[in-house]
């Protein structure tokens, strides 16, 4: 999936579970990460910085683990 700044995305749970990123993080991610609409605010290599519409810090996620939200 080609993403660009401003795109709305969500994290695909099946692609995230078992990944290196999941192993390095708290396994109990909040539901809004998988069901919500995060906005891509920056890109660096194979990662996208995503801002979710809740009062939490932005998070870096692998682009291949993201899915566009319509």
UniProtKB/Swiss-Prot annotation:
Disulfide bonds: none annotated. It is a peripheral membrane protein. It is found in: Cellular thylakoid membrane. The keyword Secreted does not apply. Pfam families: NdhO (PF11910). Keywords: Membrane, NAD, NADP, Plastoquinone, Quinone, Thylakoid, Translocase, Transport. GO terms for molecular function: oxidoreductase activity, acting on NAD(P)H, quinone or similar compound as acceptor; quinone binding. Its EC number is 7.1.1.-. Belongs to the complex I NdhO subunit family. This is NAD(P)H-quinone oxidoreductase subunit O. The gene is ndhO.
């Amino acid at each position: 999936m080609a993403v660009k700044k401003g795109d709305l995305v969500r994290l695909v749970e099946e692609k995230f579970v078992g990944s290196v990123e999941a192993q390095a993080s708290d396994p109990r991610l909040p539901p809004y990460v998988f069901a919500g609409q995060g906005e891509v605010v920056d890109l660096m290599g194979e990662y996208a910085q995503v801002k979710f519409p809740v009062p939490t810090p932005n998070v870096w996620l692998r682009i291949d683990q993201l899915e566009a939200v319509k």
